[in-house]
UniProtKB/Swiss-Prot annotation:
Belongs to the RecA family. Induction: By competence, expression activated by ComK. By DNA damage (at protein level). One of its GO terms (biological process) is SOS response. Multifunctional protein involved in homologous recombination, DNA repair and competence. Can catalyze the hydrolysis of (d)ATP in the presence of single-stranded (ss)DNA; prefers dATP at least in vitro, catalyzes the dATP-dependent uptake of ssDNA by duplex DNA, and the dATP-dependent hybridization of homologous ssDNA (strand exchange). RecA-ATP cannot catalyze homologous DNA strand exchange; SsbA and DprA activate strand exchange by RecA-ATP. It interacts with LexA causing its activation and leading to its autocatalytic cleavage. Keywords: ATP-binding, Competence, Cytoplasm, DNA damage, DNA recombination, DNA repair, DNA-binding, Nucleotide-binding, SOS response. SMART domains: AAA (SM00382). ATP binds at residues 64-71. Disruption phenotype: Cells lacking this gene are extremely sensitive to DNA-damaging agents mitomycin C, methyl methanesulfonate (MMS) and 4-nitroquinolone-1-oxide (4NQO). Double rarA-recA cells are much less viable than recA deletion strains and slightly more sensitive to H(2)O(2), MMS and 4NQO than single recA mutants. A recA deletion suppresses the lethality of pcrA DNA helicase depletion and increases survival of the strain in the presence of H(2)O(2) but not MMS. One of its GO terms (molecular function) is single-stranded DNA binding. There are about 4800 RecA monomers per colony forming unit (CFU) in untreated, exponentially growing cells. Treatment with 0.6 uM mitomycin C fully derepresses RecA expression to a maximum of about 26,000 monomers/CFU. InterPro entries: AAA+_ATPase (IPR003593), DNA_recomb/repair_RecA (IPR013765), DNA_recomb/repair_RecA_CS (IPR020584), P-loop_NTPase (IPR027417), RecA-like_C (IPR049261), RecA-like_N (IPR049428), RecA_ATP-bd (IPR020588), RecA_C_sf (IPR023400). CDD domains: RecA. This is Protein RecA.
Amino acid sequence: MSDRQAALDMALKQIEKQFGKGSIMKLGEKTDTRISTVPSGSLALDTALGIGGYPRGRIIEVYGPESSGKTTVALHAIAEVQQQGGQAAFIDAEHALDPVYAQKLGVNIEELLLSQPDTGEQALEIAEALVRSGAVDIVVVDSVAALVPKAEIEGDMGDSHVGLQARLMSQALRKLSGAINKSKTIAIFINQIREKVGVMFGNPETTPGGRALKFYSSVRLEVRRAEQLKQGNDVMGNKTKIKVVKNKVAPPFRTAEVDIMYGEGISKEGEIIDLGTELDIVQKSGSWYSYEEERLGQGRENAKQFLKENKDIMLMIQEQIREHYGLDNNGVVQQQAEETQEELEFEE
């Protein structure tokens, strides 16, 4: 063994002794380099994310205009985590969570941890404590814009507090990012949109809370309403576009189109018809939709209603879509799961 190697081994032993086992290692020695995921609650979004869902141990920012469906997207993620037996927490800085609506989306409100903090510092300290416990699978902060620094709350209405919120977010994310990765917690930060004054060229829109969240986020989702969904004269919901603006774990800039129905959340039937038609699993002739020999209905809304009433056919179409994109029932990319299984068998 060379002197250089002996010196390196001694340094590694010293680092492990001081900071604990696993604090430094060769990348090839890492037990699992693949990213574990949790389904988003939307098949279209799972495919747009490229890895079959939200990556564990990462920060995700969901932003968009008012009433675009940001909280709905986050609540669907909570419902999916709970269905897998995980623990979820919702930090409601806006004090606007509707428990009845959350329950309709599949959230178990009896088990959901809820905090409605008074200040931004309190909200982020609660988030840090939950993440460091290692017992929470997903933490949602709604929203970054509502994280008001203590100095601003205690000050007078006309006082200027330039950069306080940005400084608060920057400090919090520096502390949180490492803990989130170690605990494999999914941290979803919901954010609003503001207009920059005096912008003549380019996009005048920006998100509050400074630049730190943009840097620390592994995934950034932009949620926007595209059009209203009507039944006669009644508005039943909105067609919503979710764009993956940033993605550190798969190719970015993919878009998912979903139907967000009032009182129901993301329509699984709608996205199955859209994805099925796109992949030619569902055939469209004129305004009629059909699957193999079965006619689903005339018009998209009738076809959606048919799938709602015939869950067996819906599941068959869903399985074929998952198979095409290489997703299993948990949203995990099938190829990754098979490779992991092969490695385990080889080790045995």
